[in-house]
């Protein structure tokens, strides 16, 4: 029969992993529980077997299985969900399809629509080398990659050249930069565009004037009878030259690098466009004589011819002309090959046609050099017709020359055309890239685009997440303060545990934490297990939430619930020393050894009484006589009567006598009554047991099978105050708390009985009982355990019982339970117990004389469904020392699921 969740408890909810990273054991469990794993890449889910990813262990996905901590997982993936066994990668989902197929088939292919550089980046991210590409995709991948790298290199060079224009080392850098952009970058502003248009108009006007000056109708005759330029056209040309000169000088003055400016091809063209005009004026005005004038006139004619170079100034404003020039410069190999082929063909065919036509009358092929012209126009398929062969042999040579010319010219021309096309596209792309870069810079200056480093953005987002978590925690505390206690998830603290702690030989780590609050008579004994890998994480969470919800709702008085405020705690130290007393023979009571849970006083008292000892802690040898038992637990500072009630050890009920609180004193057991003498200031505070009616019948000797006497001990209590107040922390944290240590010594063996104490796990999971119970519950730890005889069994009376248990853990945290401790702890356990009742009709939870009933608090959460059959498997040969057995005390749902790879080890009990 499954347990029912308390009202308001959502059993499907798990611990929030938004702010608290999971334990390594939870990560390992999530990976081992399933053979498949979900890979979410860019929102596209893929499901693959773990063994498929193990084929490439050095890749990113291959390392995913070996990551068992939160930090290592975030180094491999971007996010993960352990409940869904899903890992998220914020990458290109299309490229991941090819990569995942490589894990499955061992064949790596690149999709047709993928960019080569993008696919290469994806391969680098997933840790796969590009050499694994198949031959069908490798050529295409490398070709596209080389092409893109070349374009990026050129773009980087262009941008570096433009960014290298620094004006910081010159005078008036801002003004010079603006002037340089105005003259060299027509697209930088509207004024620059207007200036470029005006410059183009001047170039066209100068070219037209140069052409019109050659018309005889417009020319003028001087005194020497020579034709000169028209005066009106000369004035137009002078204005154009003045504009060109001013433009050239402004470019030179505003240029960041003067030498680089002189070497520029466009600047050389500008200089050649204006230089002949000034040379002509200088030569004409300096030589007035007739003889000198005739010589100078020839030179001037040469410079006048150079004026036609002004048309090349249009290349500054034309991308096509710039592409043509750069294409010829980049295609010099192809051009050289073309010229070589033509030269060889001309030489061969001119020689052949000369020997074929030299014997003819009135032949025009008089020599081989004279035949070059025919071979050239024939190979280029021009054919002017001014010279041609007449003989049959000469015509055959002419036909072969035409075919050879077509083949020779046709081979390198396509290469030159492709270069021109590619360079033209590249020029256009670079112009757009420059415009885009300038637009982005303007947008950044205007604040339209915010540039941020990815690491800074991630750090900022993490800070916002922390703030959101803190705000959520504060709002939860203020809104649900009535239902919030120290077990609520809002008060959980994260404590990193090493893997060695969770996998050590210790099966359980006993921790104690006492909660004593203002206006509350409730005492909680919370324990934590350091081996959560034996149970399912989801069930641990469900049980933990169940305990959290059950305790506040089971309290009859809502005012007695926990408040967020906690008074400061102080430290008590109780030491236990042996007191030599006369040995007496203890009468052996003829009572039957209890081997069934039905004969115990309470199921809850039995299920919470098991102590765990490792194999190294069990020793048949008696411990040293001068042994000490230190019990540490936090208590509250006395301030009110309620604080005085809750100040003692766990499950220790002090008398309600008036008087000042004692700090130091001695706690002893009287022969008849169990009392606590606190004689720090002369006052005493008695501890009275509600189980005094059965003192004489229960003797420790009754359970001993030997005649070894039991030493009597005195009890001394030392209280030490610790003023520093510490907040209530969950049991899972490993931080030291203000504790109370107690040392007890037994003065009268007649008042000693045995109870099995077991910690209540903090998350509701109940570990399988496994303990070796000795006569006085032997618990050696680091030389601090008391001396006892051999490990024997106590027979329990059917009536009331008192107990003393020593528990030792690896963290030196001990527990103490005295008579009357369950007055406020346990009254009714039936609401949450779903197991079948004993057949004899008696309710073991209501056994007479078992506990006092001063508080109606429900402790049913300590019960589970198969609790009555827990000890029924104990054999009757419990008198044999060291007998071990398996104890299946709890519900089957506590154990690991059959599908889980984790194991749930059984515990051992020696009865």
From Swiss-Prot:
Subcellular compartments: Cell membrane; Perikaryon; Cell projection, Dendrite
Example GO BP: potassium ion transmembrane transport
Stretches that traverse the bilayer: 191-212, 233-254, 266-284, 297-317, 333-354, 396-424
Any GO MF annotation of the entry: protein heterodimerization activity
UniProt modification remark: Phosphorylated. Phosphorylation at Ser-608 of the FFAT motif activates interaction with MOSPD2, VAPA and VAPB.
Statement: the UniProt record of this protein carries the keyword Ion transport: yes
Glycosylated residues in this chain: 287
Disulfide partners: none
Positions of short motif FFAT: 605-611
Skewed-composition ranges (Basic and acidic residues): 508-522, 560-569, 837-849
Polar residues bias (residue ranges): 523-534, 685-711, 851-860
Superkingdom, taxonomy of origin: Eukaryota
Assembly description: Homotetramer or heterotetramer with KCNB1. Heterotetramer with KCNS1 and KCNS2. Interacts (via phosphorylated FFAT motif) with VAPA and VAPB.
Family to which the UniProt record says this protein belongs: Belongs to the potassium channel family. B (Shab) (TC 1.A.1.2) subfamily. Kv2.2/KCNB2 sub-subfamily.
Name by which UniProt lists this protein: Potassium voltage-gated channel subfamily B member 2
Organism for this UniProt entry: Homo sapiens
Gene that produces this protein: KCNB2
């Amino acid at each position: 029969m499954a347990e029912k969740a308390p009202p308001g408890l959502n059993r499907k909810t798990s611990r929030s992993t938004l702010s608290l990273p999971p334990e390594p054991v939870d990560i390992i469990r999530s990976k081992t529980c399933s053979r498949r794993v979900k890979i979410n890449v860019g929102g596209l889910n893929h499901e693959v077997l773990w063994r498929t990813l193990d084929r490439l262990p050095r890749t990113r996905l291959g390392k995913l299985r070996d990551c068992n901590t939160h930090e290592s997982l975030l180094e491999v993936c971007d996010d993960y969900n352990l409940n869904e066994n899903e890992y998220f990668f914020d990458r290109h989902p299309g490229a991941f399809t090819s990569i995942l197929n490589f894990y499955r088939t061992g064949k790596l292919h690149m999709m047709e629509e993928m960019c080569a550089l993008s696919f290469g980046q994806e391969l680098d991210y997933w840790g796969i080398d590009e050499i694994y590409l198949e031959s069908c995709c490798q050529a295409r991948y490398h070709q596209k990659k080389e092409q893109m790298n070349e374009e990026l290199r050129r773009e980087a060079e262009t941008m570096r050249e433009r960014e290298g224009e620094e004006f910081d080392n010159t005078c008036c850098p801002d003004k010079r930069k603006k002037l340089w952009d105005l003259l060299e970058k027509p697209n930088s502003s509207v004024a620059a565009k207007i200036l470029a248009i005006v410059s183009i108009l001047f170039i066209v006007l100068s070219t037209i004037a140069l052409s019109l000056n050659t018309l005889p109708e417009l020319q003028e005759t001087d005194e020497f009878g020579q034709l000169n330029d028209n005066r009106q056209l000369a004035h137009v040309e002078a204005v154009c030259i003045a504009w060109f000169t001013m433009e050239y000088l402004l470019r030179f003055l505003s240029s960041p690098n003067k030498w680089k400016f002189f070497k520029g091809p466009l600047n050389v063209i500008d200089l050649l466009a204006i230089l002949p005009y000034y040379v002509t004026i200088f030569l004409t005005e300096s030589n007035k004589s007739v003889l000198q004038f005739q010589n100078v006139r020839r030179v001037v004619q040469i410079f006048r011819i150079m004026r036609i170079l002004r048309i090349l100034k249009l290349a500054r404003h034309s991308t096509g002309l710039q592409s043509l020039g750069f294409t010829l410069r980049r295609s010099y190999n192809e051009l050289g090959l073309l010229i070589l082929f033509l030269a060889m063909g001309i030489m061969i065919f001119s020689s052949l046609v000369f020997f074929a036509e030299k014997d003819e009358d009135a032949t025009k092929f008089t020599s081989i050099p004279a035949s070059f012209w025919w071979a050239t126009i024939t190979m280029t398929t021009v054919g002017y017709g001014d010279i041609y062969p007449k003989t049959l042999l000469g015509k055959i040579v002419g036909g072969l020359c035409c075919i050879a010319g077509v083949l020779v010219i046709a081979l390198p021309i396509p290469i030159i055309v492709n270069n021109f096309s590619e360079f033209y596209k590249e020029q256009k792309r670079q112009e757009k890239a420059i415009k885009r870069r300038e637009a982005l810079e303007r947008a950044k200056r205007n604040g339209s685009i915010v540039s941020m480093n990815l690491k800074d953005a991630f750090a900022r987002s993490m800070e916002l997440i922390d703030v959101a978590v803190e705000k959520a925690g504060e709002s939860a505390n203020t809104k649900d303060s009535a239902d919030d206690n120290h077990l609520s998830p809002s008060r959980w603290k994260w404590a990193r545990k090493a893997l060695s702690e969770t996998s050590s030989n210790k099966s359980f780590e006993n921790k104690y934490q006492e909660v004593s609050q203002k206006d509350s008579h409730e005492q909680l004994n919370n324990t934590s297990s350091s081996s959560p890998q034996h149970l399912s994480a989801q069930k641990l969470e469900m049980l933990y939430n169940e305990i959290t919800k059950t305790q506040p709702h089971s309290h009859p008085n809502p005012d007695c619930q926990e408040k967020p405020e906690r008074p400061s705690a102080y430290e008590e130290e109780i030491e236990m020393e042996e007191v030599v007393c006369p040995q007496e023979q203890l009468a052996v009571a003829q009572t039957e050894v209890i081997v069934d849970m039905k004969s115990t006083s309470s199921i809850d008292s039995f299920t919470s009484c098991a102590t765990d000892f490792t194999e190294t802690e069990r020793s048949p040898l008696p411990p040293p006589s001068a042994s000490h038992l230190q019990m540490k637990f936090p208590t509250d500072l006395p301030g009110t009567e309620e604080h005085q009630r809750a100040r003692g050890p766990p499950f220790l009920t002090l008398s309600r006598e008036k008087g000042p609180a004692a700090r130091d004193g001695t706690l002893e057991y009287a022969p008849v009554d169990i009392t606590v003498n606190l004689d720090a200031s002369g006052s005493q505070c008695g501890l009275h047991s509600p189980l005094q009616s059965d003192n004489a019948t229960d003797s420790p000797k009754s359970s001993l099978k030997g005649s070894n006497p039991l030493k009597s001990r005195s009890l001394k209590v030392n209280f030490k105050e610790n003023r520093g107040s510490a907040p209530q922390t969950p049991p899972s944290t490993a931080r030291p708390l203000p504790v109370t240590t107690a040392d007890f010594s037994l003065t009268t063996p007649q008042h000693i009985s045995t109870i099995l104490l077991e910690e209540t796990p903090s998350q509701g999971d109940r570990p399988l009982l496994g303990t070796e119970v000795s006569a006085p519950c032997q618990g050696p730890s680091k030389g601090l355990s008391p001396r006892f005889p051999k490990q024997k069994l106590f027979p329990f009376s059917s009536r009331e019982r008192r107990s003393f248990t020593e528990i030792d853990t690896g963290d030196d945290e001990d527990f103490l339970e005295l008579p009357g401790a369950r007055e406020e702890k346990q009254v009714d356990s039936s609401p949450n117990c779903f197991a079948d009742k004993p057949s004899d009709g008696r309710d073991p939870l209501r056994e007479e004389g078992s506990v006092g009933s001063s508080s109606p608090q429900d402790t049913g959460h300590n019960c589970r469904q198969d609790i009555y059959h827990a000890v029924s498997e104990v054999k009757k040969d419990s008198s044999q020392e060291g007998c071990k057995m398996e104890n299946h005390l709890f519900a089957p749902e506590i154990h690991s699921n059959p599908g889980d790879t984790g194991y749930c080890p059984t515990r051992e009990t020696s009865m």
